[in-house]
């Protein structure tokens, strides 16, 4: 992944992903790719095939009506994907172009409202869960750039001991690394979920906090 740019037109927004060869020359052909519209969390995910082995950028602010930011993530399978965080409801179409190789996402206003958005901090993005009703086991997924790729989840409720789980993301040096893990069981009722890291400087929590209503097993 060499670059990401965008354009605004009267009837749509266009996000363009450019690619380069290992020696830095523009790629002639685009990689294989597939897309998934995760409307529940206002994210359009574009997954790349085995041809994409590195990235020159990790994230990009996008100043357009329909898109807020793009994250380049190393997935759990080792392959890269880009998440486009959408600012407003949209319908999407993905196409590719050769000479030079590009991937183009056209976004047009429309569709149903998004129920939720990812929780975002400087080095942490939580895609699931979203604020509201949850059940156990509680699955936590997202991506991060924490020190040494460590990810901590802490579940807190008044009158209950803290529940903690830890995992390791797939990257932290080159780009964002995906993570997913479960908290098998925990307190019911109103709970607070922290996902992030302990600061390498002073040990304080750095990450996102979610207000949840926890029920029993699903």
Language-model segments: which ranges?
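Short linear recognition/processing motifs and adjacent strand/loop elements at protein termini
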Residues: 1-125, 138-141
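Ser/Thr-rich low-complexity repeats and stalk/linker segments
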Residues: 123-124, 128-218
């Amino acid at each position: 992944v060499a670059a990401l740019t965008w354009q605004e037109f009267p009837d749509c927004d266009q996000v363009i992903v450019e690619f380069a060869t290992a020696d830095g020359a523009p790629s002639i052909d685009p990689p294989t790719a597939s897309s998934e519209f995760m409307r529940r969390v206002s994210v359009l995910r574009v997954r790349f095939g085995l041809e994409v082995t590195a990235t020159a950028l990790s994230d990009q602010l996008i100043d357009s009506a329909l898109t807020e930011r793009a994250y380049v993530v190393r997935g759990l399978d080792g392959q890269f994907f880009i998440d486009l965080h959408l600012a407003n409801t949209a319908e999407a179409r993905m196409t590719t172009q050769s000479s030079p190789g590009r991937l183009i996402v056209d976004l047009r206003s429309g569709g149903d409202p998004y129920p939720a958005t990812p929780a975002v901090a400087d080095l942490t993005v939580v895609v699931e869960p979203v604020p509201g009703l949850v059940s156990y086991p509680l699955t936590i997924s997202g991506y991060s750039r924490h020190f040494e790729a460590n990810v901590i989840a802490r579940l807190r409720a008044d009158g209950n001991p803290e529940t903690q789980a830890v995992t390791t993301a797939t990257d932290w040096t080159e780009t964002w690394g995906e993570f997913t893990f479960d908290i098998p069981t925990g307190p019911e009722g109103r709970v607070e979920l922290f996902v992030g890291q302990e600061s390498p400087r002073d040990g304080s929590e750095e990450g996102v906090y979610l207000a949840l209503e926890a029920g029993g097993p699903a």
